[in-house]
Design a protein with these regions (language model features):
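Short functional linear segments
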Residues: 1-53, 60-62, 66-71, 78, ...
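ATP-dependent carboxylate-amine ligase catalytic core
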Residues: 20-26, 36-44, 70-158, 170, ...
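Hydrophobic alpha-helical packing residues
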Residues: 64-69, 134, 365, 393
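Nucleotide phosphate-binding/pyrophosphate-handling subdomain across enzymes
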Residues: 136, 141-146, 153-164, 168-172, ...
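Conserved catalytic-core segment of NTP-binding enzymes
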Residues: 150-151, 159-213
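Beta-strand->loop->alpha-helix junctions that form or flank phosphate-binding loops
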Residues: 198-201, 213-234, 269-274, 296-303, ...
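C-terminal helical cap/extension that packs against the catalytic core
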Residues: 203-213, 318-319, 362-429
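Glycine/aspartate-rich loop-and-adjacent alpha/beta segment that forms the canonical ThDP
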Residues: 435-453
Length: 453
């Protein structure tokens, strides 16, 4: 089979089971475990860091990949979704899986499914392709990102070494539950039999969910509470300074402690946004468990790039691409923009999937008086046209007078550029966000290589 044919078949599996089968979640999980066994349990004895969380999974996995690769290890990384190529999801030593290997391991999985009259969905077969590939490559460490939730996720068929949870907030509530308790329970479901769990959020619901699964956990925000985070607004980087807790006079305030003892170690993150410090702390803690030096950690960070995470696509005009796609990620995106621009200096171009809380997301953007273009994602799963989003906003009684509805994202971008170039224009930057698919579509129309998305 050829790669185009295989990718078409894989993407058509999005219509099969749609993440959750008609069976109960537990039954589907048992089916996935059966398939995993039939595939001879790839990566069974590997060192695996399993990463769950509402936001920040991809950044955390990439921090780990960069650091451990710089330390001389062979590293594998599985993330989702991709932006330009399906192969982006499956990396070994920072190199994408080849088309030939996608075809090879697709055929292995399909042979098992056909012989046992089993069906699985898009994400599930992608997970099994990745695990088979990682087994063949014999990587030292595997960094495995969940697709949705954790407890019943396809990635949870493996026995991981360390569980990592970035954070918990509201997203996919129809599938994960409508409370933080329920969502946290799903995320904490990746923890295996009392194994070490490292997480990065001071949230009681998450702390309680973790404690139900293990007595062996580290909240890095508490462990490294003496932390200073600054933004390098000239180079779009984040500066993190970690201060040791020992030998400090508890009667002094935190600033006095930092200045007096100067015990900090400074790291420069290539990703912009104070929230990235939380993701980095998880990677830092895991790196220290395996004895990786601070110098190697920084070397690994220096060699990292990650598309769609406050990505500077253009400097003239300033164009920022960000995959923020839910309440929490849009909130932190706005916080980062506040460090660079005034509220009325930014033009947003975005589209949002129909599965998201559209009203809440737009309220966070509209309250800042940004100019907004809404575009169409009608051609992707769960995507909406600009007019459909308009109806959603009107039904939520959200004013749309500062919004331009333009289905074509390239036309929206050209109009936004014209607004910036006008004489005495107040606008200084364009931000494209709302979905991985929005970023993919934008890059496609701007001449970047694109395959199925």
């Amino acid at each position: 089979m050829k790669i185009d044919e295989v990718l078409e078949k894989i993407f058509n599996m999005r219509t099969i089971n749609k993440r959750i089968t008609n069976e109960s979640l537990k039954q589907n999980n048992e089916k996935l475990k059966k398939i995993y066994e039939l595939l001879e349990e790839p990566c069974k004895n590997k060192k695996i860091v399993h990463i769950a969380g509402t936001n920040g999974k991809g950044s955390t996995a990439t921090f780990l990949e960069g650091i451990f690769f710089a330390a001389g290890y062979s590293v594998a990384k599985f993330t989702s979704p991709h932006i330009l190529r399906f192969n982006e999801r499956i990396l070994v030593d920072k190199e994408m899986i080849s088309d030939e290997d996608v075809v090879k391991y697709y055929e292995v999985v399909m042979d098992i499914l056909e012989k046992n009259s089993l069906q699985i969905n898009f994400f599930e077969i992608t997970t099994f392709i990745a695990l088979l590939y990682f087994e063949a490559k014999n990587s030292d460490f595997i960094f495995l990102e969940t697709g949705l939730g954790g407890r019943y996720d396809a990635t949870n068929v493996v026995n991981s070494t360390i569980a990592a949870i970035t954070n918990v907030s509201f997203d996919h509530v129809s599938l994960l539950g409508n409370s933080l308790d329920k969502i946290a329970d799903r995320k904490a479901g990746i923890i295996k039999d009392g194994q070490l769990c490292i997480y990065a959020q001071n949230l009681s619901e998450l702390e309680n969910a973790v404690k139900k699964e293990t007595d062996n956990s580290v909240n890095v925000l508490k462990k490294y509470e003496n932390l200073q985070v600054e933004l390098d607004t000239q180079n779009y980087k984040t500066i993190v300074k970690i201060f040791k807790n020992e030998n400090l006079d508890e009667s002094e305030n935190i600033e006095d402690k930092k200045n007096k003892y100067n015990l900090g170690k400074t790291f420069i993150l290539p990703l912009f946004g104070k929230f990235q410090a939380n993701n980095f702390l998880i990677a830092y803690e895991i790196a220290k468990i395996y004895g990786i030096s601070d110098e190697i950690i920084q070397k690994g960070l220096d060699e990292i790039s990650l598309a769609g995470r406050f990505e500077i696509f253009s400097q003239n005009p300033v164009t920022i691409l960000d995959v923020a796609h839910n309440d929490d990620s849009v909130r932190v995106l706005v916080e980062s923009l506040n460090e660079l621009f005034k509220n009325d200096e930014v033009i947003f171009i975005l589209s949002i999937l129909g599965t998201k809380d559209i009203a809440n997301i737009f309220e966070k953007i509209l309250e800042k008086n940004y100019k907004i273009f809404i575009t169409s994602l009608k051609d992707v799963t769960y995507g909406l046209s600009a007019n459909e989003i308009k109806k959603n906003l009107e039904n939520a009684n959200i004013l749309t007078n500062n919004i331009i509805f333009e289905d074509n994202i390239l036309d929206a971008y050209n109009q936004a550029k014209e607004m910036i170039l006008e004489k005495n224009s107040r606008y200084k930057a364009i931000v494209v966000c709302g979905s991985f698919y929005e970023i993919a579509k934008f890059k496609k129309l701007c001449g970047k290589r694109d395959e199925y998305f």
